[in-house]
Amino acid sequence: MTDNSNIRVVVGMSGGVDSSVTALLLKEQGYDVIGVFMKNWDDTDEFGVCTATEDYKDVAAVADQIGIPYYSVNFEKEYWDRVFEYFLAEYRAGRTPNPDVMCNKEIKFKAFLDYAMTLGADYVATGHYAQVTRDENGIVHMLRGADNNKDQTYFLSQLSQEQLQKTLFPLGHLQKPEVRRIAEEAGLATAKKKDSTGICFIGEKNFKDFLGQYLPAQPGRMMTVDGRDMGEHAGLMYYTIGQRGGLGIGGQHGGDNKPWFVVGKDLSKNILYVGQGFYHDSLMSTSLTASEIHFTRDMPNEFKLECTAKFRYRQPDSKVKVYVKGNQARVVFDDLQRAITPGQAVVFYNEQECLGGGMIDQAYRDDKICQYI
C-alpha cells in the first residue's frame, strides 16, 4: 500500500455529505488531511439565522469524527468581486449567467487553492463528481463522474491545467447512493443531510425578490414575434430563453392551446418575445458564438475541433464542429438545438473527457442572429 502520510490534502468542506465523505476517504487512504470551510456569502436571514453557521457546525462535527484539523476562511469579498458582480452584470445585459462555473473558476479552485497552499497543501480536494487522470507526459485530463446523474464537469469546464494538476476528486468513481451509504456506515453527522440545490447566495429566498434588491426591474411589453401585444412583462432579467412558467398568458389569447415560451429579448426596446410550442421556430438554432473559450490543456491559437457539447447542465451531448480563434469560437451543430441561452456555458467533450468550454454570446439560425438580445 502506498504511504500517503507525507502528502497534505486540503479539503473544501461545505457541511454536506459529499465533502464529508471526500475527507473521510482521503483520511482512510492515509493522506495528511485538513478540512476548510469557505464562507462566501453573508446569508443571515430576517430572523438572524445564518445557514453558514449551521454548516460550519456540521463541518466541525465531521472533522472531529474522522480526526482531522479544520479551519474556516472568509471569501465574502472575493466572491462578491469575482462572482456576484459578474452575476449582476450578466443580468443587466439581459443574459442568464452561470455563477457555479464562475465560482469554481475564481473561488473554489483559485482563492481556495491559494489559501490551501499557505497551509502547505500538495493538493486540494472537493466533493465534485468528476475524475482526473494523468497521462505519461504528466498532463491531467478531466473525465466525467461515473454517476451520470451527478457528473459536474459542466461546472468545472473553466479549470486550467495548473488547477487540475493540484486537484483530487475522490468521489469521481462513485455513485451518489454509495456516497450516502459510506457516510451512514461511518456514522457521519451529515449522512442524512439533504443536498443543497440552487444558487448558494439565494438559498431558499424568492429569486425575483432577491434580484430586485440589487437591480431595479424595468417592466415592458410582451410581444409575439409577429408583433401581437401580449401584455406586460415584469423585467427582462426575470426571464430566460425557453422558459415556460411565469408568463401569465396561458391560453387566453386564442390559438391552439399550446403552452407559451420565452423565445427572445430585445434589450434596446425592453421587449420580451414569446411564442407557442416547445419547438417554436424562434427557439431553434443551428450554431452559436462563444467567448472566454478555455481548454483544460494547451491548445493552438486557431484550430477546428469535432466533438460533442452540452449547452446546459444534465443535457445529453450533441455533435458539434468548433472553430476556435483565440478565446472566441463558433460552434456549429449537427442537429437543430433548442433554447440556446446567452450567458450559459457551452462545454466540449471527447467521449468521457471534458475538454473545456466557454460562455455563450449569441445563437444563430443559419447566418441570422436568433431573436434574442
UniProtKB/Swiss-Prot annotation:
GO CC annotations, alphabetized: cytoplasm
GO biological process: tRNA wobble position uridine thiolation
Region (Interaction with target base in tRNA) residue spans: 98-100
Highest taxon of source: Bacteria
Catalysed conversion reaction: S-sulfanyl-L-cysteinyl-[protein] + uridine(34) in tRNA + AH2 + ATP = 2-thiouridine(34) in tRNA + L-cysteinyl-[protein] + A + AMP + diphosphate + H(+)
Residues at which ATP binds: G12, M13, S14, G15, G16, V17, D18, S19, M38, G127
Sites marked Interaction with tRNA: H128, Q344
Residue ranges, annotated region (Interaction with tRNA): 150-152, 312-313
Chain's role: Catalyzes the 2-thiolation of uridine at the wobble position (U34) of tRNA, leading to the formation of s(2)U34.
HAMAP family assigned: tRNA_thiouridyl_MnmA
Family: Belongs to the MnmA/TRMU family.
Name of this chain's protein: tRNA-specific 2-thiouridylase MnmA
Lineage per the UniProt record: Bacteria, Bacillati, Bacillota, Bacilli, Lactobacillales
